[in-house]
A protein has these predicted regions:
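Glycine-/charge-enriched secondary-structure boundary and capping motifs
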Residues: 2-9, 13-25, 29-156
Length: 156
C-alpha cells in the first residue's frame, strides 16, 4: 500500500505566523561581516568553523581532529519550517538533525574563555549566538544532541 499523503501545509489561519512560501523564500542571513571581524580580531581563538548546511548537526564530526565527544545540549529551538518539513516527510528527529541544520547554520569551535567575546561580536551585528555545547576527549568520534524530542546519539 502507498503511504498516506502528507498532511496539508499549515497556513497563517492554523496558528502559523507566516505561510510556507514566505518561510521557504525568505533570504538567508549572511555571516560574512561577522566572520570578517571574528577572523580579523579573534583568529587565534577560533579552533574550527563548520557551516552546518549540507550535513546538518552531524557535519562537525567530519572535522574532529581525533576521538572526541561533541555534546550539543543548548541548541536553539528549530524554526517552524523544520516542523513543516518533518510533518510532510514523515522523518524522525534523528533524520531531521542529520540532514538539516535545524536553524544552526554556523558553528564556531573555541575555548570557553573566548566564547563570550565571540558571542558579543555576533550580537553587535544583531545575530543571536550562544554556547550550544562542548567537546570532550573520548574513545571514538561521537555526537550527542539534546533536542526537544530527546537525546540523539551519533557515532562514527
Amino acid at each position: 500500500p502507498s503511504p498516506a499523503p502528507p498532511s496539508p501545509v499549515p497556513s497563517p489561519s492554523s496558528g502559523w505566523s507566516t505561510d510556507i512560501g514566505h518561510l521557504l523564500l525568505s533570504p538567508t542571513r549572511t555571516y560574512a561581516p561577522v566572520l570578517k571581524r571574528l577572523l580579523t580580531e579573534k583568529f587565534a581563538d577560533i579552533h574550527g568553523l563548520v557551516h552546518c548546511s549540507g550535513g546538518g548537526q552531524t557535519k562537525c564530526m567530519k572535522y574532529l581532529p581525533g576521538d572526541f565527544l561533541v555534546i550539543k545540549d543548548n541548541l536553539f529551538a528549530p524554526p517552524p519550517v523544520f516542523e513543516i518539513i518533518q510533518r510532510a516527510s514523515g522523518s524522525d528527529a534523528r533524520e531531521m538533525y542529520q540532514v538539516f541544520n535545524m536553524g544552526h547554520r554556523l558553528e564556531i569551535f573555541t575555548t570557553p574563555g573566548a566564547a563570550e567575546e565571540l558571542i558579543a561580536i555576533s550580537h553587535s551585528f544583531g545575530i543571536d549566538a550562544r554556547i550550544v555545547g562542548r567537546v570532550e576527549p573520548a574513545s571514538k568520534k561521537s555526537l550527542i544532541l539534546k533536542t526537544p524530542s530527546g537525546d540523539i546519539l551519533f557515532d562514527l
